């Protein structure tokens, strides 16, 4: 795929994610996809690298915490060879009524027309506090 095709694939994935069309988003991930988040699991439980099945479970959990979805707005995007780097912001209303807003930098690796690897950088402290409070309110 060309770098433009890779960018389109990533933007399509994030469009599905933002619209809570998680099955369509998952279809764009390779079966052996890994998704990595920074941090230490004892401080940020989502930290580390997970497989596609775990990503699927986490997406299902998102709907419980963010019943109206998580709108993702994309910013700068750069592609080279099989990699796409992208800045983004998210906004959504948590189940406890609080607003959730975070900033991200993603690195996607594309292979055979699918997303093979994702590295997601975000404010893990904010995510832990906001999402933890939403879980506790359910």
Question: Positions of the model-derived regions?
Answer:
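Short, low-complexity N-terminal intrinsically disordered segments enriched in polar/charged residues
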Residues: 1-31, 133-138
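Hydrophobic pocket/interface hotspot
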Residues: 10-13, 25-26, 33, 55, ...
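A beta-strand edge to alpha-helix "cap/lid" segment located at domain peripheries
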Residues: 2-5, 60-138
